[in-house]
Amino acid sequence: MRGRLCVGLHLMSTTSRSTLMIVGLGNPGSEYETTRHNIGFMVVDAFAAAVDEQWTHPSSLFDEARTRYAGIEVVLIKPLTYMNLSGKAVAKRSRELGISPTRVVIVTDEYNFPVGKLHLKQGGSSGGHNGVASVIDELETANFWRLRCGIDRRFGPGELVEYVLAPFDASQKDDLAAMIDRGCEAIRQIAKLGPALAMQKINTNGS
């Protein structure tokens, strides 16, 4: 019995090291596709298209696409729970696959950065982001990674919700496209190097 348990724990730890989960935060539905809050969906959609992988629907909580890149399995997740309950999908799938929170990267919007800026960090508070807060609550740790994508801060008091649920400005089209491309490259670097080693490169080139 002890031998079986040790083998099981070894397999789980191996899976945790070799599998990377990339979670794009956003809201499901065509009405939200181009909104600022959905930049996470945009990045993982673009990466899935770049590696020619299709999305599947293994759970009512999320869509998923899988690929192998740089010798590891990369699991892409889009929660279908709406932003404020995103953590339910992240917790369910990461536990099913035995993926440690330190191998989970959340791709999310950040209004404190201009459009085009990317920044990778591990841990910390939610920064008032309800999707990130939900992931912290459901994983019972803040020790996952966040790839934060700038959406700019063009709103006044009481206008945050309306702002994040509105599309990017037409004048930001080129910066948005470049940021999505760099988001895909960031995922490649994280897969190749691991988040800790990729962080400096991503943040140096994050504009």
Language model: regions and residue ranges:
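Nucleotide and nucleotide-moiety/phosphate-recognizing core
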Residues: 2, 7-123, 133-147, 154-159, ...
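Short, loop-centered acidic/histidine patches that primarily coordinate divalent metals
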Residues: 149-152, 168
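The feature captures the short pre-catalytic strand/loop hairpin that immediately precedes
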Residues: 158-168
